[in-house]
């Protein structure tokens, strides 16, 4: 669910391993939700002029905006949401996917989502929103790969 079907090799990466280690310090999901809320403070916030329908993620329970830019061959994301827990989720996604080449983003297996139990602990609508957000972030990356062709 969190990766493209054509990629069969799961490559561990240090950022996702750090996320897994951080979440392993908490015994229950109330503490993990508190941690997600604290992560919302580190979210690279989208520019106010980009909080428009053009940047909104369809399929999310909350309002979510995501933007991407390419700098020195690496993709960087900014985002915002009207829900604080979602801001924490966005912060995790940006941490795991940002600062990579567009092709790396397209190919990245976001295995940390299953490893920390996130999928099982989100409501179905929040889970659908997470999938929609990941899809949009990958679409931005794919568009940047096409620009470089």
Task: Set out the residue ranges of the language-model regions.
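A generic alpha-helix surface/boundary motif
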Residues: 17, 87-88, 106-107
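Alpha-helical support elements that line or immediately flank enzyme active sites
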Residues: 89-100
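N-terminal amphipathic/basic-hydrophobic helices that include classical n-h-c signal peptides
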Residues: 1-9
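Short, surface-exposed beta-strand-loop junctions and turns on beta-sheet-rich folds
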Residues: 83-85
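Glycine-rich phosphate/pyrophosphate-binding loops
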Residues: 99-116
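N-terminal intrinsically disordered, cationic/polar leader segments
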Residues: 9-63, 69-76, 113-149
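Solvent-exposed interaction patches of small proteins and small membrane subunits
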Residues: 54-60, 81, 103-108
């Amino acid at each position: 669910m969190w990766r493209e079907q054509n990629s069969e090799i799961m490559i561990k990466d240090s950022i996702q391993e750090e996320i897994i280690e951080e979440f392993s310090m908490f015994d229950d999901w109330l503490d993990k939700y508190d941690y997600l809320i604290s992560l919302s403070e580190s979210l690279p916030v989208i520019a106010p002029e980009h909080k428009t329908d053009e940047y909104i993620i369809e399929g999310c329970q909350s309002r979510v905006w995501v933007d991407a830019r390419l700098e020195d061959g690496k993709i960087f994301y900014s985002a915002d949401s009207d829900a604080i827990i979602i801001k924490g989720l966005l912060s995790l996604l940006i941490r795991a996917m940002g600062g990579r080449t567009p092709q790396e983003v397209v190919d990245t297996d976001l295995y940390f989502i299953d490893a920390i139990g996130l999928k099982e602990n989100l409501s179905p609508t929040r889970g659908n929103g997470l999938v929609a957000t990941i899809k949009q972030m990958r679409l931005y990356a794919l568009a940047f790969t096409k620009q470089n062709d």
